[in-house]
Amino acid sequence: MPEYRSKTSTHGRNMAGARALWRATGMRDGDFHKPIIAIANSFTQFVPGHVHLKDLGQLVAREIERVGGVAKEFDTIAVDDGIAMGHDGMLYSLPSREIIADSVEYMVNAHCADALVCISNCDKITPGMLMAALRLNIPTVFVSGGPMEAGKTKLAEHKLDLIDAMVIAADDSASDEKVAEFERSACPTCGSCSGMFTANSMNCLTEALGLSLPGNGTVVATHADREQLFLRAGRVAVELCHRWYGGEDPTALPRGIATFEAFENAMTLDIAMGGSTNTILHLLAAAQEGEVAFGMQDIDRLSKRVPQLCKVAPNTPKYHIEDVHRAGGIMAILGELARGGLLHTNAATVHARTLADAIAQWDVTQTDDENVHTFYKAGPAGIPTQIAFSQATRWDSLDTDRSDGCIRDVAHAFSQEGGLAVLYGNIARDGCVVKTAGVDESIHVFEGTARVFESQDAAVKGILADEVVAGDVVVIRYEGPKGGPGMQEMLYPTSYLKSKGLGKQCALLTDGRFSGGTSGLSIGHASPEAAAGGAIGLVREGDRILIDIPNRSINLLISDEELALRRAEQDAKGWKPVEVRPRKVTTALKAYALLATSADKGAVRDKALLDG
């Protein structure tokens, strides 16, 4: 039977010094025979998705200790992509994922913790902690801070989010007063931004992976029901310890839960709900950490068979995450996918023996349990606040309309092809990704003229200066993991294309990535990236590019001979931007770039370089 890892420092005469230090943290004689459970919190006052987490780690800690464990909390960093957006701060966003993963590994392994509770929420924090959990492979449960309530204003017919504030700010026809009103109304509460952006997408995917509890991705941060998720997460962590250390149950460990089948389930959910393209990057990275052979080809295969069953902002202004919860949350989407024969329902979870058992218990269309129905009626209060669990508003009814509601059944899908697709061609040999859920069907096949920019900054200037016109393909390169470095999000270029009325008349292609708030014909993660010799680095001003989503292709319309000639010329010059870019690349960023792989590998470290 496995022994507690913590015995390394809590047992034996020669560990008297270590025990003395443990005692200084508050441990007593009886605690040295209990599991030590690490709580990885991510509280910070910089990020609205994390500003309310300060006391929640101790909430979990008290529950762990009430049911027989010893809790030890620490914090990791959290970067706000929205605040870091549009300047050199965004260079640090994706690299922070690796720092978060490393910091969790460092703390847990240095102190020989027996289990882990991950309190995450925003864009890189959930993926970073997920990578760490799969590296460590000790009993782990995730609980997120929860989504922000959607904003409201009398100046808009629909609810608001961060993207609305960004788009209106670049609209020359909007008054300063209207911009100010949107700014004040778009982000009213604590929590992760209210649409199906990267943070909420990832928190929803942890439900499908089996590593978090039902409602983790959809109960708003302000609602009292989320407190019960935190308390239950503490209890589950102790239960997982008993199952592993007391019974050697492999499904108590992350790698026993997040198997290949579970990754397929998570990606199937992602495609069905039109999640952020960043989720592809993060799932690929997590799979590598868990030694799961899940790759771009698997995502491509799934994207061709999974329909889109849920459509949420930024893909429509009608629904936000709070509306997904009212419709039954992630368990309801998983239920529809299961009935369509699209899931591996025998996959394990931290809270139920199988996913099938979880769906039977939590799918609002399948259970008569009033407690479950009440849980999914948890709604927004519409009161600006930064305090968790501060309201208990409930919808009068659930949205169970599966033919015309927020969540659809397979027969009434928003589209029979899902919300994400992988494209291949001579411009992206190893693939690139597009969120089809946000692309108007009229431009699913698009041929346009290349407008080439060597940085996001240059592209923004060009778009705002009206240098981009209808029919153009904006190409932004040398913004990949190595080339940026850091693979910046291109939210400002896509938002400004909308502001200029070009959202349905142009395409954007980059080796960088996109915010979960992006919509339109925005194609990212072009692999290999330009800095790694990718063909996106060979595109020239005025070239024609053909994008064909139905046939999953993207091609630069030049001959193979011309492409080879350009490659030889570029090899001689070196793969770097033509123009010197005014950005400060620090030693920390250079270290990240040195080991970073392209997006098709999840932009993780190249282990071949480390292994020598």
Curated annotation (Swiss-Prot):
GO terms for biological process: isoleucine biosynthetic process; L-valine biosynthetic process. [2Fe-2S] cluster binds at C122, C193. The keyword Lyase applies. Its EC number is 4.2.1.9. Mg(2+) binds at D81, D123, K124, E489. It catalyses: (2R)-2,3-dihydroxy-3-methylbutanoate = 3-methyl-2-oxobutanoate + H2O; (2R,3R)-2,3-dihydroxy-3-methylpentanoate = (S)-3-methyl-2-oxopentanoate + H2O. Binds 1 [2Fe-2S] cluster per subunit. This cluster acts as a Lewis acid cofactor. This is Dihydroxy-acid dehydratase. It comes from Xanthomonas axonopodis pv. citri (strain 306). The lineage of its organism: Bacteria, Pseudomonadati, Pseudomonadota, Gammaproteobacteria, Lysobacterales.
